[in-house]
A protein has these predicted regions:
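Terminal-tail/helix-coil boundary detector
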Residues: 38, 62-101, 105, 120-125, ...
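Conserved, mostly hydrophobic/aromatic
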Residues: 17, 36, 43-46, 99, ...
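Glycine/proline-rich, positively charged
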Residues: 1-31, 42
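Short, well-ordered coil/turn segments that N-cap beta-strands
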Residues: 12-15, 39-41, 46, 123-125
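Short amphipathic alpha-helical segments and helix-helix/interface helices
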Residues: 5, 29-36, 115, 153
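Aromatic-lined glycan-binding groove of carbohydrate-active enzymes
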Residues: 28-74, 109
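Glycine-rich beta-alpha junction loops
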Residues: 1, 21-27, 47-58, 117, ...
Length: 181
């Protein structure tokens, strides 16, 4: 978190910070990202497709396996969730639906525009993208040579703004009591 980053900056020059960041998971934009930008710290983003949510693989919260539905985007009543929060499933899946609609309008895959949005963000140096098959790899690679017009970047940001606001500044995906100092 921002406090841990501040402590580390007093001890050493920090070059990169590895954090979860994607269209649905934007809490780092509140405090951590501005601090990284101020100190020239590059961001390595993990979970850039929100564990597959941004691929359009899941049409509703009920389709998401327990192991993937334990983040604060989902109800704290899910079997493996430990955060104890209400979750924001309705807002999350409304945003996913709107992202898919925009991708269809652009005749692109939602994963491609989601990765391109993330690449467009200030301070991003790398995305840690996983692929379970050659087909997923073929889908992800073109996103690194694809740029979105600013108007589409702004639309995507707007689509997920309510999710961002409900999550607040707690960048901990799994715990409602922010363990990230």
């Amino acid at each position: 978190g921002v406090n841990g980053l501040s402590d580390a900056l007093r001890s050493a020059k920090i070059l990169t910070n590895q954090l979860p960041y994607n269209l649905l998971w934007r809490p780092i934009e509140v405090e951590i990202l501005p601090k990284c930008l101020k100190h020239d710290i590059g961001l390595i983003c993990y979970s850039p497709l929100a564990q597959g949510l941004l691929t359009g693989r899941y049409s509703s919260p009920d389709n998401v396996p327990d192991g993937l539905s334990r983040s604060r985007l989902f109800s704290g009543k899910r079997p493996l969730a430990a955060h104890g929060e209400e979750g924001i499933e309705n807002e999350t899946f409304k945003a996913i639906s709107d992202i898919i609609s925009l991708a269809n309008e652009l005749e692109e895959h939602p994963a491609k525009i989601s990765l391109a949005w993330l690449r467009s963000r200030p301070g991003i140096t790398s995305l840690l993208v996983g692929a379970r098959s050659p087909e997923e790899l073929d889908l992800n690679i073109p996103a690194f040579e694809y740029s979105l017009p600013q108007s589409v970047i702004d639309r995507l940001s707007s689509i997920t703004q309510s999710v961002k606001e409900k999550l607040g500044s707690n960048a901990d995906m799994w715990n409602g009591n922010n363990r990230m100092r």
